Regions:
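Rossmann-fold dinucleotide-binding core
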Residues: 1-7
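Mid/C-terminal beta-alpha module of Rossmann-like enzyme folds, strongest
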Residues: 11-82, 93-124
Length: 124
């Protein structure tokens, strides 16, 4: 089973942060910000592949191998372990998309597909 996540577009996150900094709307709150839909890692890879015109597939790796790879990239073990726990939990307990993003941004949140289109050049 793949992890299900609701990735948030950085423009939506930035808009929510600006609102939080410039108003009192979010004082004493801790909103959970998400993108508008749940997607699997395989779906993410497929969308990136479609955008760049090359097939990309998601390949599941053993958590210890993933940890070793992250360590080789200079990622601290505490961060690597946190990421691995996040994705493991997202398999059985995905964080559902929240409407708070629309409320904070003032418009519907951007989809993962839109994020991919906005970042296509980054994948080439």
């Amino acid at each position: 089973t793949d992890a299900l996540i609701a990735p948030i577009h950085e423009r939506d996150l930035a808009a929510a942060i600006v609102r939080a900094l410039l108003s009192d709307d979010l004082l004493s709150t801790a909103p959970v910000l998400t993108g508008p839909e749940l997607v699997t890692q395989a779906e993410q890879a497929k969308l990136i592949g479609e955008a760049i015109g090359k097939p990309i597939r998601f390949e599941r790796v053993d958590p210890s191998d993933a940890r070793d790879h992250m360590a080789a990239q200079g990622i601290p073990s505490s961060i690597a372990d946190s990421l691995l726990r996040y994705y493991e939990r997202a398999i059985s307990h995905p964080i559902e998309p929240t409407p708070i993003s629309t409320d904070l941004v003032g418009e519907p949140p951007r989809s993962y597909r839109q994020w991919v289109l906005d970042h296509t050049a980054d994948f080439r």
